[in-house]
Amino acid sequence: MATQTVEGSSRSGPRRTITGDLLKPLNSEYGKVAPGWGTTPFMGVAMALFAIFLSIILEIYNSSVLLDGISMS
């Protein structure tokens, strides 16, 4: 037999930890969906700003944007 049950060692349920107690409120909304679009527009704006930020960093790295007074060695 592959599994074996030991007498008197029944599991009483999940263990409670301090970390679990602290994170419990973050999981209390699990399965609930905000009506309508929710925060989708905010996420779209955040993604657009992040893409602009990355393109600025790339342009600086490629020296396609010249910065006055800063020497690139």
UniProtKB/Swiss-Prot annotation:
The modification Phosphothreonine is found at residues 3, 5. Its main location: plastid. Gene3D superfamilies: Photosystem II reaction center protein H (1.20.5.880). Phosphorylation is a light-dependent reaction catalyzed by a membrane-bound kinase; phosphorylation occurs on Thr residue(s) in the N-terminus of the protein. Residues 1-12 have a biased composition (Polar residues). One of its GO terms (biological process) is photosynthesis. Coiled coil: none annotated. GO terms for cellular component: chloroplast thylakoid membrane; photosystem II. The chain crosses the membrane at residues 41-61. InterPro entries: PSII_PsbH, PSII_PsbH_sf. One of the components of the core complex of photosystem II (PSII), required for its stability and/or assembly. PSII is a light-driven water:plastoquinone oxidoreductase that uses light energy to abstract electrons from H(2)O, generating O(2) and a proton gradient subsequently used for ATP formation. It consists of a core antenna complex that captures photons, and an electron transfer chain that converts photonic excitation into a charge separation. Belongs to the PsbH family. PSII is composed of 1 copy each of membrane proteins PsbA, PsbB, PsbC, PsbD, PsbE, PsbF, PsbH, PsbI, PsbJ, PsbK, PsbL, PsbM, PsbT, PsbX, PsbY, PsbZ, Psb30/Ycf12, at least 3 peripheral proteins of the oxygen-evolving complex and a large number of cofactors. It forms dimeric complexes. This is Photosystem II reaction center protein H. The lineage of its organism: Eukaryota, Viridiplantae, Streptophyta, Embryophyta, Tracheophyta.
